[in-house]
C-alpha cells in the first residue's frame, strides 16, 4: 500500500480507534511510524523516517498523559523541524530542543490543546501542514491555517484532506485557507490503502518500451486516486500507453508507437516519477524536458 496514505491513516487510527486499515505499506518508514505510535518508553527513535518525525511531533504534543524524547539518526538530527515546533508552540504545545535549536532531538510534554488559528508560509513541507491538520480535528476549537504565498506539494495536502473527509471529518481548503472542524469521534469503518502510483511508474515504462499490443494488469489501483502520481495515466498517453480503469484494477496497453519526439512536462506536483519518465524517454529516443 501507499506509504503516504498508510502514515496518515496510522495517525488517524491512533486518534480514532474505531478506524481499521487494510493493505498498509510494508515500508521501513511506515514501520517506524507504527512503532513510534505504540512504544511505551520515554525515548522514541524514528531513525531516518522523516514523516514519522513530523507526524509524531504533532501527535505527542497533544497527548496529555505522555512525556517523550523524540529523536532519530544523525542525519535526522540535521533535518530542520523548527517551523512545525513553532506552530505547535503557538497553539500551546510544550516542546524543547535538546541539542541544536530548530532540530531534533525534541523533549515533548503532552498538553491539552484548544486549537484555533495559525498563519504559516504556504511553501513549507506539506508534511508540516498535514501533521497539524491530522491532529487538528481533535482540538475543541478545531484548526484553521492561513497559508501565506503559493502552496507547494498540493497533492499531498489534498490527500490529507480527502482522508479526513473519508472518515467523516469536515476539512475544507478554500484558496489559501484550510479549516478542520472538531470531530470527537468517527463511525467504525475499514479503509483499504491504495498501492503507490509511483511504483506503477516502472510498469508504465515497461509497457511504453514494449511492442504495440503489449498489455498488463495492476491490481487495486483507483481512478479516483488521492495520489498526485496518478497523473501517470495521462502522461504515458504521450508514449502510446492507454490506461483502462476496471473496478479494482487497471490495464495498461501499448496502443501505438507514433508519438512526438519531444516531451515537456512540469512535475512540481509529482516529482517522484521524474526519473522513470526520463528513462522512458531515453529508451524511446524522445527528447525530454522536465521541470518542477
Tell what function each PLM region has.
Residues 1-292:
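Short, structured segments at the rim of ligand-binding sites
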Amino acid at each position: 500500500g501507499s506509504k503516504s496514505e498508510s502514515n496518515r491513516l496510522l495517525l488517524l487510527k491512533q486518534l480514532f480507534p474505531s478506524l481499521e486499515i487494510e493493505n498498509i505499506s510494508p515500508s521501513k518508514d511506515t514501520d517506524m511510524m507504527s512503532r513510534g505510535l505504540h512504544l511505551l518508553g520515554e525515548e522514541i527513535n524514528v531513525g531516518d523516517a522523516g514523516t514519522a518525525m513530523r507526524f509524531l511531533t504533532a501527535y505527542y504534543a497533544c497527548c496529555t498523559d505522555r512525556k517523550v524524547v523524540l529523536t532519530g539518526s544523525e542525519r535526522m538530527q540535521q533535518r530542520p523541524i523548527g517551523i512545525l515546533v513553532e506552530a505547535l508552540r503557538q497553539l500551546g504545545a510544550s516542546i524543547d530542543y535538546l541539542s541544536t535549536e530548530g532540530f531534533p532531538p525534541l523533549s515533548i510534554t503532552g498538553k491539552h490543546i484548544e486549537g484555533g488559528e495559525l498563519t504559516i508560509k504556504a511553501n513549507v513541507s506539506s508534511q508540516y501542514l498535514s501533521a497539524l491538520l491530522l491532529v487538528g480535528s481533535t482540538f475543541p476549537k478545531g484548526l484553521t491555517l492561513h497559508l501565506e504565498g503559493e502552496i507547494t506539494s498540493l497533492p499531498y495536502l489534498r490527500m490529507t484532506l480527502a482522508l479526513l473527509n473519508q472518515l467523516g471529518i469536515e476539512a475544507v481548503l478554500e484558496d489559501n485557507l484550510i479549516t478542520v472542524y472538531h470531530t470527537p469521534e468517527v463511525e467504525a469503518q475499514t479503509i483499504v490503502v491504495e498501492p503507490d502510483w509511483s511504483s506503477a511508474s516502472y510498469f508504465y515504462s515497461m509497457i511504453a518500451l514494449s511492442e504495440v499490443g503489449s498489455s498488463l494488469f495492476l491490481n487495486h489501483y483507483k481512478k479516483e486516486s488521492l495520489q498526485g502520481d496518478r497523473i501517470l495515466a495521462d502522461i504515458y498517453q504521450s508514449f502510446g500507453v492507454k490506461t483502462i480503469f476496471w473496478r479494482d484494477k487497471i490495464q495498461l496497453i501499448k496502443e501505438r508507437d507514433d508519438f512526438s519526439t519531444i516531451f515537456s512536462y512540469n512535475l512540481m506536483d509529482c516529482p517522484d516519477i521524474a526519473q522513470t519518465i526520463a528513462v522512458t524517454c531515453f529508451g524511446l529516443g524522445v527528447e525530454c524536458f522536465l521541470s518542477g
